[in-house]
Structure formats: structure tokens, C-alpha cells
Curated annotation (Swiss-Prot):
Stored PANTHER family: INNER MEMBRANE PROTEIN YEIH-RELATED (PTHR30106), UPF0324 INNER MEMBRANE PROTEIN YEIH (PTHR30106:SF2)
Annotated signal peptide: none
InterPro entries in the record: UPF0324_pro
Membrane spanning residue stretches: 21-43, 58-80, 87-109, 113-135, 142-164, 169-191, 235-254, 269-288, 295-314, 329-351
The name this protein goes by in its record: UPF0324 membrane protein RPA1770
GO cellular component entries: plasma membrane
Length: 354
């Protein structure tokens, strides 16, 4: 009777509930670490001379120094990965609440043409220059995708069809993260030198900087309008990820048609958070959000993006750039310079101002 009574009083926990509890326990420490770094980055802005520096930029720098100085503890890794993926995507979705369809239309056909031309030219140039340098084809394609579209997310998505070694994936991610971080430092310094207005600077950052969070952080360094426009431009670029992966998948199947063993088809991933971003723009268009609530949303979004940048820093191992020699690193650097120069040239040649 006692066993029956105990079974009624303490029914067995549902397996899904147990799994969820274990998952939350695994990611909590790392999420707290990224939140602490984000809080420190926000707090550092109170220091005289620091207010003009984005907390997102400070967060990734703190993360890089911490990871390469003392290392990221193993117990924090699950939460760090969660912040880099889920938290980042949720923050991007929330960014939609700061935008309207009128702003979305501002990119226009010419702006989209600049973004598309930059993407295609950068990918083709990187693949060609990789052959010139003698870099492995798979690693070259990963660096090309990461540089031309959206950094680590594009590399991971592209690898579903490229099927490179884990070391190549790690190298490519480190490459685009490091050179994207350098762009975060240099771009704001060049805005006035290059005589770019808010729209021009936003388009330049959105069309050329690798990671979404990096592009958002840099574009907002040029002001609210530049930040909003840079976000739209960058998300427009991300939408081109699926077509690129489809094209690479078709190319991979052509290469593998004489290999009878193994199915080389792959379903290209859809960056679903882009749909959430667009949905939030629609919400902002048709729902009257109080000004005070919008202020909180802006602050929360910036904090979540800082968490994602902190996680990116905590996964950036500078030694990985040296592990496979200098040629792939040279390829990544050259590709980064190419996309910056090509997109800027198109903006200047077309006289684009939004």
C-alpha cells in the first residue's frame, strides 16, 4: 500500500521535463558568464571617455581576452554556445520592433543590387584567390561563404554541403570572427574620413561586415539611423544564405555524381529568425507600442546582442589562425578587404545615399 500511496503522491517525472531540466542546468552557467561580460561592457561605458564605444564591441573584446588569456571553462561551453546561437537570434528578432516597413523600403532596388553584387563578387573572388594561394577547396568555400554572407552561421550552413573537416570549420569561424572584429574597430573610424552619411555607412556595414551581431554593433556606432539601416541591409544579405547553399549543394552533387557510395544531397537551412525579424516589423507597424516599452526593448536588445558578442569572443581562439599556416589566414584577410573595398566602391560610384 505504501508503494502505491507514494506513487500517487510522487508520480514519475515526464522524460521531457527531466531532459529540459538537465538542459537548463547545463546552459545556465555559460549564459550567466556571457551575461556578466555584457553587464561589465555596459558598466564600462560609465568610465570617462568610454560612452562612445559600443558595449557590443567591448563585450567581444573582453571575451577574446578572457578566452585566449585564461580559457573558457568546459562547464561554460554549453551556455556560451546557447548565447551565440539562440540568444543572438532572439535579439535579432527583437530588433524588428525598432523598425518599420517604411524603413525597409529605404534599401530600395539599388541598395539590394549593391548587396547582391557585393556578395557574389566576394564569393567568386575568394574562391579564385584560394586556388591561387593553394588553400584547400573546402576551407576556401567556407571562408568565402562566411565572408560574403553572415560569418559563422554561413560557414556552418555551407558545411552541410561542403562537408569539410571540423578543423576547417573551426579555422573558418575563427578567421571571419577575428577579421570581422577588426572591422568593428576600424569602420567607425573611417565614416567621417570616407564622408559617408548615416544611410551610406549603414549600407556599407550591412553589405560587408561578416557576422550579424558585428554588423549591428558597428552600424549603430554611426548613430540610430545608421544602425537601423545597417540592420536591414545585413538581414537582406542573410536572406541570400539559402540560395547560396542550394547552389553549392547542386555543385557538390555534380562533383560527386561519379561516387556511387553515399548520398551527397543536403537540405539547405532556412535562417528562420529572419522570418521572426520580419514579423516583428509587422507588429511594430500595426500595434501601438508605448514609448517607455520601446525604450526597454531597445535596452534589452542591446544587452542580448552584447551577450552574443561576448559568447563569440569566448569561442575565438587566436591560435587556430596559426594552426594551419598563414595562407588561409591571408585568404580571409584579403577577402575581408575585398568585400569592404568592393561594397564601398559601389556605394561611391553609384552616388547612393538611400
Amino acid at each position: 500500500m505504501s508503494l502505491i500511496t507514494n506513487a500517487k503522491l510522487y508520480p514519475p517525472r515526464h522524460p521531457r521535463a527531466v531532459h529540459l531540466a538537465h538542459h537548463l542546468a547545463a546552459i545556465a552557467p555559460g549564459v550567466l558568464v556571457t551575461a556578466a561580460i555584457a553587464a561589465a561592457a555596459v558598466g564600462l561605458r560609465a568610465i570617462p571617455g568610454m560612452p562612445g564605444i559600443s558595449p557590443m564591441l567591448l563585450a567581444i573584446l573582453i571575451g577574446i581576452v578572457a578566452h585566449n588569456g585564461i580559457g573558457t571553462p568546459s562547464w561554460a561551453v554549453p551556455g556560451v554556445k546557447f548565447s551565440l546561437r539562440r540568444v543572438l537570434r532572439f535579439a535579432i528578432i527583437l530588433l524588428g520592433l525598432q523598425l518599420t516597413t517604411a524603413q525597409l523600403i529605404e534599401v530600395g532596388g539599388e541598395g539590394l543590387a549593391i548587396i547582391a553584387a557585393t556578395l557574389l563578387a566576394t564569393f567568386c573572388f575568394t574562391v579564385w584567390f584560394g586556388r591561387v594561394l593553394g588553400v584547400d577547396r573546402k576551407l576556401t568555400e567556407l571562408i568565402a561563404a562566411g565572408t560574403s554572407i553572415c560569418g559563422a552561421s554561413a560557414i556552418i550552413a555551407t558545411n552541410t554541403v561542403t562537408r569539410a573537416d571540423d578543423e576547417d570549420v573551426a579555422y573558418g569561424v575563427a578567421c571571419v570572427t577575428v577579421f570581422g572584429s577588426l572591422a568593428m574597430v576600424s569602420y567607425p573610424l573611417l565614416q567621417s574620413v570616407l564622408n559617408l552619411d548615416a544611410h551610406g555607412f549603414g549600407l556599407w556595414t550591412g553589405a560587408s561586415i561578416h557576422e550579424i551581431a558585428q554588423a549591428v554593433a558597428v552600424s549603430f556606432q554611426g548613430g540610430q539611423r545608421a544602425g537601423e539601416f545597417g540592420t536591414i541591409a545585413k538581414l537582406s544579405r542573410v536572406m541570400m544564405l539559402a540560395p547560396l547553399v542550394i547552389g553549392l549543394g547542386m555543385l557538390a552533387r555534380v562533383r560527386a555524381k561519379h561516387q556511387p557510395a553515399g548520398d551527397h544531397t543536403a537540405t539547405p537551412p532556412m535562417p528562420w529568425f529572419v522570418l521572426g525579424f520580419v514579423a516583428m516589423i509587422g507588429v511594430n507597424e500595426f500595434v501601438a507600442i508605448p514609448h517607455e516599452a520601446k525604450s526597454w526593448i531597445v535596452a534589452i536588445t542591446a544587452f542580448l546582442l552584447s551577450m552574443a558578442l561576448a559568447a563569440m569572443g569566448l569561442e575565438t581562439d587566436l591560435r587556430k589562425l596559426a594552426a594551419r599556416g598563414l595562407r588561409p589566414a591571408l585568404l580571409g584577410l584579403t577577402a575581408s578587404l575585398f568585400i569592404a573595398g568592393f561594397s564601398l566602391a559601389l556605394i561611391k560610384l553609384t552616388g547612393w545615399h538611400g
